[in-house]
Amino acid sequence: MDTKMYDLTGKVAIITGSTRGIGNAIAKLMAKNGAAVVITGRKQEACDKVAAEIEAEGGKAIGVATSVDDPASRENLVKTTVEKLGRIDILVNNAGVGGQPRNMLDMDEEFYDTIMNADLKAVYFMSQLVARQMKEQGREPGVDPYRIINMSSAAGIKSPRGDTVYGAAKAAVTHLTRIMANELARYGITCNAIAPGYVLTDMTKDVMADEKNVAAVTKMISLRRYAMPVEMATVAAFLASPAAAYITGVLIPVDGGMTIN
């Protein structure tokens, strides 16, 4: 196997929501593969801590506190990245609000807006800012393209009860990714999405600690187990690598077979 096909040396990658969970695993793997990574989260202290962990392992990282649902904060992230690292080659739109089951008849507009702003609107406008920067940097279509990777969800494929807003937002992210791929290809940018299923993270570990919950969840999954964050990271790192240069506009479910079960 030609390991250079997975090498990210010289690339600059922004991973939103990377102080913990899936985003953290993605950032650490991309750094291990040679990328300079930008760690983002709401608290600067948490961002700096993860960046320091990466640098202690020989990687390159900076931390930039960011609220992806705030336009000024998004702009500061892009500006700071370019000022400190010189460019942007990879964007992973990972930050968002997790599914919090609430039936449609109990939904209120404030909760609806919170989910949509974080899980769809932020993805759209974060991608817009970074794509503008990538266009300015210049790249011929098909020549070592820039990458935008969006985190969708299995909830955007299946139709889970109580996840009307979250599921709709993630389904929209999937279709947005396809449209982005078509529109941004002319600037040498590929756009793909990943749909995680149930993943053990800080946000889900309490739920997964209950044996009844674990049994109920694994029953829905063909491989009969939940995923670990690194299993999402390996796919993201692949999509960011030279090995995936000819892939654009696709959704990759990483769900252990949940969406086919």
Language-model features: locations:
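Substrate-binding pocket helix/loop in short-chain dehydrogenase/reductase
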Residues: R102-M104, D108-M116, V217
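Conserved glycine-rich cofactor-binding loop
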Residues: V12, T19-R20, K43
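Short C-terminal tail/terminal secondary-structure segment
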Residues: D2-K4, P101, K158, A237, ...
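Residue(s) in the substrate-gating loop at a strand-loop-helix junction
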Residues: S153
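Alpha-helical segment proximal to the catalytic Tyr-Lys
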Residues: R132, N182-R186, A245
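Active-site helix of classical SDR
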Residues: S127, A169, T177
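C-terminal helical subdomain
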Residues: A193, A215-A243, I247, G256
